[in-house]
């Protein structure tokens, strides 16, 4: 039984994301993970702002992305994306994720995505806001990985 905190997002898979074998192309999984993390931000009361000053935590870069492909996703439909926080540092945040069938029974891919908040003036690492840290603490994993 999975009792770790996580954010669950149902991500639509469209026919134009499929390869010639009707499988979700490997390059599309990161986009679905990004959509899930964006939905988590929105559910937290934050949104992407035209002015960085209105939401400084949105000014971050992806430092690392690791994906392990487990099973093919065949055809269009819905894919479940579970997102949790593996670690949060002063300037970095490591998300864990699991992409699976809509019912969560078939795992397709799992991995980690690391982001680093940067200062918009210097492009150097910059600390997360208290709001970001508090909201992400809700998803902090404290037990072994899901899959």
Model-based region annotation:
Residues 40-93, 108:
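Hydrophobic beta-strand-centered segment that forms part of the acyl-chain substrate-binding groove
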Residues 14-23, 59-61, 72, 117, ...:
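Residue-level preference for alpha-helix termini and adjacent loops
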Residues 22, 83, 123:
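Hydrophobic pocket/interface hotspot
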Residues 1-43:
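Catalytic strand-loop segment that frames the active site of acyl-thioester-processing enzymes
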Residues 3-9, 72-78, 86-147:
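HotDog/MaoC-like acyl-thioester-processing domains
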Residues 12, 66, 114:
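Short aromatic/hydrophobic contact patches that present stacked aromatics
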